[in-house]
C-alpha cells in the first residue's frame, strides 16, 4: 500500500487549513498519491441525519453517507480519480479493468477526462445502464459470459500482450487511496470525531480496507486515538463469502459458487483482499451479516420514501443490517451509526421497475 510522511503531513493537514480547501477528496492531498489530479469533483458527499428512519429503528444517532452523489453516481469515482491520476503520471497509455457495473462507468469517465483510452470487461448480464454509460464515455467495452472473476481473469491474461495498465481491484495501490478519503470526510463532518459503528456493503471491500488504512494514518497524525468504529460488513444471501468466512472464524473466504444477487456490486464471489476485510472487521469488534434481495428492495423503498434518498440495492442493504443489529441490541440507541449508500438507485432502474411491478 502507499505510504506517506505522516509527520510532515500532520503539520499542514489541520482542521483550520482544511476549511479553506476545495470541497472534494483532493483536499487531503498530503495523503494522496498524485500531484496533478484528474478530478471531476468527487468526494465531500453529504452526511445526512436519518431521523425518520432512526426513530423507527430506535437509533438516535443514525446517519447516511450518500456516495451516490459522486460523479458517475457511486463511490467508485474516488478510487478511479486516484488510480487514473497516478496512471497518467506514470505514463500509462491504455487502462483496463473488469467491472460488475459502477467501477466501469467511473473508469470510463476519468479515463476520458485524462485523455487515456480504456478497456472495460463486463459480465454479459451487467445492467444496461452501466453498459451504455461506459460506451457514452468512449470506452472499449468487452462483454463476457460469466462473473466479474471471469472478467478479471480476461484482463490478467491479456494485459501484457495488449499493453494495458491494470486498474483492477487491488492490482494497483491507488484505488484504496481514493476510497480511504471517506473516513477522512467522516472525521471532518462529525466534528473531529468518528462514529461508533460503520455499516458498509461489501463486494471487493476496497472501501472498507481503505477506511481502516485511513484510521491508522489519522492516529499517527494525532487526529484520533486508538479507538475505532466497529466495522460491519453486509452482503447478499446469494453471494456472502465474507460473511461465511467470518462466521466460521476463517482468515480467508472460499469462492462462492453460483453467485446471484440484484446488487451487482455485491456479486463478487471471491474478494482478492478478503483477509484484509476480515481482519478489519475482527480487529474493530465488528460483525458480518447477509440480507436477501427482497429485503434490500423493501429497505430501499423505505429509505426513499422516509429520507428522500434513492439508494442502490447495496446501500439499501445497510438499512436491513442496521435494523437486524439494533433488534439484537448490538447497536445501542445513543450510539452514532453511519450507513454507506455506495451508489445511486437510478442506475438500477430495471431492477426497481421489476420490484415495483411485483408490489
Where does each model-flagged region fall?
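PLP-dependent amino-acid enzyme catalytic core
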Residues: 1-359
Amino acid at each position: 500500500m502507499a505510504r506517506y510522511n505522516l509527520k510532515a503531513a500532520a503539520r499542514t493537514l489541520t482542521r483550520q487549513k482544511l476549511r479553506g480547501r476545495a470541497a472534494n477528496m483532493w483536499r487531503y492531498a498530503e495523503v494522496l498519491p498524485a500531484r496533478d489530479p484528474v478530478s471531476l469533483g468527487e468526494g465531500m458527499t453529504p452526511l445526512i441525519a436519518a431521523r425518520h428512519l432512526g426513530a423507527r429503528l430506535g437509533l438516535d444517532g443514525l446517519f447516511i453517507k450518500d456516495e451516490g452523489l459522486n460523479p458517475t453516481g457511486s463511490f467508485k469515482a474516488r478510487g478511479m480519480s486516484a488510480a487514473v491520476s497516478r496512471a497518467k503520471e506514470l505514463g500509462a497509455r491504455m487502462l483496463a479493468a473488469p467491472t460488475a457495473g459502477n467501477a466501469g462507468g467511473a473508469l470510463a469517465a476519468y479515463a476520458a477526462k485524462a485523455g487515456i483510452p480504456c478497456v472495460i470487461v463486463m459480465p454479459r448480464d451487467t445492467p444496461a445502464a452501466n453498459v451504455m454509460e461506459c460506451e457514452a464515455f468512449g470506452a472499449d467495452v468487452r462483454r463476457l459470459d460469466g462473473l466479474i472473476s471471469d472478467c478479471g481473469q480476461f484482463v490478467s491474461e491479456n494485459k501484457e500482450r495488449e499493453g494495458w495498465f491494470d486498474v483492477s481491484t487491488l492490482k494497483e495501490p491507488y484505488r484504496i487511496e481514493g476510497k480511504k478519503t471517506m473516513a477522512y470526510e467522516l472525521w471532518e463532518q462529525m466534528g473531529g470525531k468518528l462514529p461508533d459503528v460503520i455499516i458498509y456493503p461489501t463486494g471487493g471491500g476496497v472501501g472498507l480496507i481503505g477506511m481502516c488504512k485511513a484510521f491508522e494514518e489519522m492516529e499517527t497524525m494525532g487526529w484520533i486515538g486508538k479507538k475505532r468504529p466497529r466495522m460491519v460488513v453486509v452482503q447478499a444471501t446469494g453471494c456472502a463469502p465474507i460473511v461465511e468466512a467470518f462466521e466460521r472464524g476463517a482468515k480467508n473466504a472460499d469462492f462462492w459458487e453460483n453467485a446471484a444477487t440484484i446488487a451487482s456490486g455485491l456479486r463478487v464471489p471471491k474478494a482478492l483482499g478478503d483477509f484484509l476485510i476480515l481482519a478489519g472487521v475482527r480487529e474493530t469488534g465488528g460483525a458480518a451479516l447477509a440480507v436477501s434481495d427482497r429485503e434490500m428492495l423493501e429497505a430501499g423503498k423505505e429509505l426513499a420514501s422516509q429520507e428522500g434518498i434513492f439508494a442502490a440495492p447495496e446501500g439499501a442493504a445497510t438499512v436491513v443490517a442496521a435494523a437486524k443489529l439494533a433488534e439484537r441490541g448490538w447497536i445501542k440507541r445513543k450510539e452514532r451509526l453511519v450507513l454507506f449508500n455506495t451508489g445511486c438507485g437510478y442506475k438500477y432502474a430495471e431492477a426497481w421497475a421489476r420490484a415495483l411491478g411485483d408490489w
